[in-house]
């Protein structure tokens, strides 16, 4: 059962009920709290575009607790984060794994955060293929190209040499918040909610 909390806000015109995600969106906060598929990506991209149209000068925050998911869906979010004018800060709560970790690192440099007990996991893309040999070969070439593309972006976002990223993403590589900071995936481990993260 998916229960979405409702909050009541008092205004001079009376009370107004919001689902919690709509209320957070008013404060320019987007929640990425699930696996990343096309539906999730479309929702996140729509929220980013809406917030840019509302105020292109004001930062946006994305809170991430995600096991990862589809590369193409994640890249749609990544490209939109880079495309829009507002700076996008990212905050890891719980776990940012796979494409979730990639999006965490994709936040505005200096505005990528993690809570102290959160974890980050990076690895190479997962995929599979079936069918005729030529179809399997096409799929294998594509996943290798995607791996190279993701590794290059991670190297640029973290400041790590490409060879280090290639080695470290060869298998599941879990990092604590402090290790993610040292590696360059984030810029600060948050212990208190402060206005400087927005």
Curated annotation (Swiss-Prot):
PROSITE patterns: CLP_PROTEASE_HIS, CLP_PROTEASE_SER. It is found in: Cytoplasm. Pfam families: CLP_protease. It comes from the Bacteria. GO terms for molecular function: ATP-dependent peptidase activity; ATPase binding; serine-type endopeptidase activity. One of its GO terms (biological process) is protein quality control for misfolded or incompletely synthesized proteins. The keyword Hydrolase applies. Belongs to the peptidase S14 family. Cleaves peptides in various proteins in a process that requires ATP hydrolysis. Has a chymotrypsin-like activity. Plays a major role in the degradation of misfolded proteins. Fourteen ClpP subunits assemble into 2 heptameric rings which stack back to back to give a disk-like structure with a central cavity, resembling the structure of eukaryotic proteasomes. This is ATP-dependent Clp protease proteolytic subunit.
């Amino acid at each position: 059962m998916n229960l979405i909390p409702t909050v009541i806000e008092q205004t001079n015109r009376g009370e107004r009920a919001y689902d919690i995600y709509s209320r957070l969106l008013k404060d320019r906060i987007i929640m990425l709290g699930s696996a990343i598929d096309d539906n999730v990506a479309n929702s996140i991209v729509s929220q980013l575009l809406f917030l840019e149209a509302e105020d292109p000068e004001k930062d946006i925050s994305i809170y991430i607790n995600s096991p990862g998911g589809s590369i193409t869906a994640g890249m749609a979010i990544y490209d939109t984060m880079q495309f829009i004018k507002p700076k996008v800060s990212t905050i890891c709560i719980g776990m940012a794994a796979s494409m979730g970790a990639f999006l965490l690192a994709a936040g505005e440099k200096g505005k990528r955060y993690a809570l102290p007990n959160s974890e980050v996991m990076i690895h190479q893309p997962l995929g599979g293929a079936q069918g005729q040999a030529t179809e399997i070969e096409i799929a294998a070439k594509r996943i290798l190209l995607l791996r190279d593309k993701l590794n290059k972006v991670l190297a640029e976002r973290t400041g790590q040499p490409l060879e280090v990223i290639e080695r470290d993403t060869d298998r599941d590589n879990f990092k604590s918040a402090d290790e993610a900071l040292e590696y360059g995936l984030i810029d600060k481990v948050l212990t208190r909610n402060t206005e400087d993260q927005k």
